[in-house]
Amino acid sequence: MTANAGPATALQLAELDSQGFTIIEGFLDRERLARVNALFDAWLGGYQGRNNFEGTCTERIYTLVARDRVFQDIVEDPRVLALCDALLAPNYLLTASQAIVIGPGETPQPWHTDDYFYPIPRPRPMVSLSTIVAVEDFDAANGGTEVIPGSHRWSDAEVAGYYRQGDSEEDPALA
């Protein structure tokens, strides 16, 4: 996937290297954001989580790129593709496109990594890149994903020992 990729910015690449994430401010224009929210409004109500990890008060809508062209356009955004091109091996693949809508009263997930299934010891070279597109305010109070800056450089032992279910959600290391 390298359709119309532009150059990644030096700042974004430096942030990804040092802290493990970067933010693309103003990623969705108003028209695209309105389209995404209208689609979600129409679809929500039939996709409750199936287990404790997914959450029983959370809805997940899978395969967004198969549902509407707007999601294909988001996935192929040149700013994201530029980062993928700079950081991943050629011919990388999209493995998931989903919406996660966390409902009131949801139990927080235990801290985890999204690349646990790669059988390569940590710390390791970048083998995947996750993209989160927030379509509303995104914070700990409404269940927004929290990240630990620099945790992408941790060893397997550090990842395994950091967080256990029931630990304080107010941990200052969580950003």
Annotate each language-model stretch with its function.
Residues 54-57, 125-131, 160-168:
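Short C-terminal domain-edge/linker segments immediately following a structured domain
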Residues 4-5, 138-175:
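Double-stranded beta-helix
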Residues 113-115, 133-137, 147-149:
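Short, structured patches in soluble enzyme cores that scaffold and shape functional sites
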